[in-house]
């Protein structure tokens, strides 16, 4: 079972760039592992650090600003997560501590992979995202509340509605990944297996 996602209130970091691809999110040289942990240290590695080893933080990159340390909601521009289909991208984001990404649009494969890893991709209009960028930049350290049950983002004195399809919403609310979904049918699977001839078991 994955962690249930119902509501999250967190610090927002504004990454004001469009077409952020998966190679920028987690560069290919860090993809040797197949477990989901440890990738957060290399998130946006080529932007966060001035050296290849990741030891010299880039003071001009927004994730390194003191006011955004501990951010768990990422605000970005359109076509977030484009490029190759590596699932390591949501792994890196969640391992770093992000629970939500808000953007006008997402690459399809990244969007699906996010739900598989309990990272909530929230799609709002360009105009709404513009408003949120202005709000965050005027109020560094502001927190948003993201309510998956109600499908709303509460930011400042405004509320923004978003839509997640029923199946994915059900899975996130109940902490169901692919294994969890399969285990929901464990009894039916066992009954089916018991009906098979012995030589097929």
Curated annotation (Swiss-Prot):
Catalyzes the isomerization between 2-isopropylmalate and 3-isopropylmalate, via the formation of 2-isopropylmaleate. Its EC number is 4.2.1.33. One of its GO terms (cellular component) is 3-isopropylmalate dehydratase complex. InterPro entries: 3-IsopropMal_deHydase_ssu, Aconitase/3IPM_dehydase_swvl, AconitaseA/IPMdHydase_ssu_swvl, IPMI_Swivel, LeuD. CDD domains: IPMI_Swivel. It comes from Salmonella schwarzengrund (strain CVM19633). It catalyses: (2R,3S)-3-isopropylmalate = (2S)-2-isopropylmalate. Belongs to the LeuD family. LeuD type 1 subfamily. Gene3D superfamilies: Aconitase, domain 4. Keywords: Amino-acid biosynthesis, Branched-chain amino acid biosynthesis, Leucine biosynthesis, Lyase. Heterodimer of LeuC and LeuD. One of its GO terms (molecular function) is 3-isopropylmalate dehydratase activity. Pfam families: Aconitase_C (PF00694). GO terms for biological process: L-leucine biosynthetic process. This is 3-isopropylmalate dehydratase small subunit. Pathway: Amino-acid biosynthesis; L-leucine biosynthesis; L-leucine from 3-methyl-2-oxobutanoate: step 2/4.
């Amino acid at each position: 079972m994955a962690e249930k996602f119902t509501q999250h209130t967190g610090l927002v970091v504004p990454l004001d760039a469009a077409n952020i691809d998966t190679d920028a999110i987690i560069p290919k040289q860090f993809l040797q592992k197949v477990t989901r942990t440890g990738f957060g240290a290399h998130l946006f590695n080529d932007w966060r650090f001035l050296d290849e080893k990741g030891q010299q933080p880039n003071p001009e990159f927004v994730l390194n600003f003191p006011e955004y340390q501990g951010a768990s909601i990422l605000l970005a521009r359109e076509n977030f997560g484009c490029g190759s289909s590596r699932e390591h991208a949501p792994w890196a984001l969640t391992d770093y501590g992000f629970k939500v990404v808000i953007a006008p649009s997402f690459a399809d494969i990244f969007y699906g992979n996010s739900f598989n890893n309990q990272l909530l991709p929230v799609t709002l209009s360009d105009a709404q995202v513009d408003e949120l960028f202005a709000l965050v930049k005027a109020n560094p350290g502001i927190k948003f509340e993201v309510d998956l049950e109600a499908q709303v983002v509460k930011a400042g004195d405004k509320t923004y509605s978003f839509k997640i399809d029923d199946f994915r919403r059900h899975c996130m609310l109940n902490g169901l990944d692919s294994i969890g979904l399969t285990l929901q049918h464990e009894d039916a699977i066992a009954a089916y297996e018991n009906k098979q001839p012995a030589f097929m078991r």
